[in-house]
């Protein structure tokens, strides 16, 4: 049964501008150490901005699906987006603000200047 759905769209040049202006301060506030480390394999700032924009959208979409937004102590860094060996995106949570009986489905996409994410939370 579906518990909640969430979607978000991010303007990639905005993430590029913010990361250029605030650098590590912005990245460390929003992304996990693992997300930042993985991003270093991309040489281009534009490609890194796409990477970060998709993860930003995924975190926003997740809290929308959860129905709480960023409240009740949830912060961006509590949510980690990673890909499996085949490239399928997954979402991991560092705090217990969702039951382990829930299954989270995540889809990410980008096209030119926009990144999108769609999250479905299901009750097992």
Swiss-Prot record:
Pfam family, one: ACPS
InterPro entries referenced in this protein's UniProt entry, alphabetically: 4-PPantetheinyl_Trfase_dom (IPR008278), 4-PPantetheinyl_Trfase_dom_sf (IPR037143), ACPS (IPR002582), Ppantetheine-prot_Trfase_dom (IPR004568)
Reactions mediated catalytically: apo-[ACP] + CoA = holo-[ACP] + adenosine 3',5'-bisphosphate + H(+)
Annotated localization: Cytoplasm
Main location group: cytoplasm
SUPFAM superfamilies found in the cross-reference section: 4'-phosphopantetheinyl transferase (SSF56214)
UniProt KW NAD keyword: no
Keywords, sorted A to Z: Cytoplasm, Fatty acid biosynthesis, Fatty acid metabolism, Lipid biosynthesis, Lipid metabolism, Magnesium, Metal-binding, Transferase
Enzyme Commission identifier(s): 2.7.8.7
Cofactors: Mg(2+)
GO MF term set: holo-[acyl-carrier-protein] synthase activity; magnesium ion binding
GO cellular component, one term: cytoplasm
UniProt: Mg(2+) binding residues: 8, 60
Biological-process GO terms, alphabetical: fatty acid biosynthetic process
Source superkingdom: Bacteria
Enzyme type, top EC level: transferase
Function in brief: Transfers the 4'-phosphopantetheine moiety from coenzyme A to a Ser of acyl-carrier-protein.
Family (UniProt): Belongs to the P-Pant transferase superfamily. AcpS family.
Protein name per the record: Holo-[acyl-carrier-protein] synthase
Organism: Wolbachia pipientis subsp. Culex pipiens (strain wPip)
Gene: acpS
């Amino acid at each position: 049964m579906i518990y909640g759905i969430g979607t978000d769209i991010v303007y990639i040049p905005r993430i590029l501008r913010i990361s250029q202006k605030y650098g590590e301060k912005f990245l460390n506030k929003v992304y996990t150490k693992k997300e930042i480390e993985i991003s270093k394999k991309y040489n281009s700032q534009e490609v890194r901005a796409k990477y970060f924009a998709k993860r930003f959208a995924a975190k926003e979409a997740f809290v929308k699906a959860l129905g709480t937004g960023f409240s009740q102590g949830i912060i961006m860094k509590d949510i980690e987006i990673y890909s499996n060996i085949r490239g399928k995106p997954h979402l991991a949570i560092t705090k217990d603000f969702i039951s382990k009986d829930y299954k989270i489905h995540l889809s990410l996409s980008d096209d030119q200047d926009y990144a999108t994410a769609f999250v479905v939370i299901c009750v097992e």
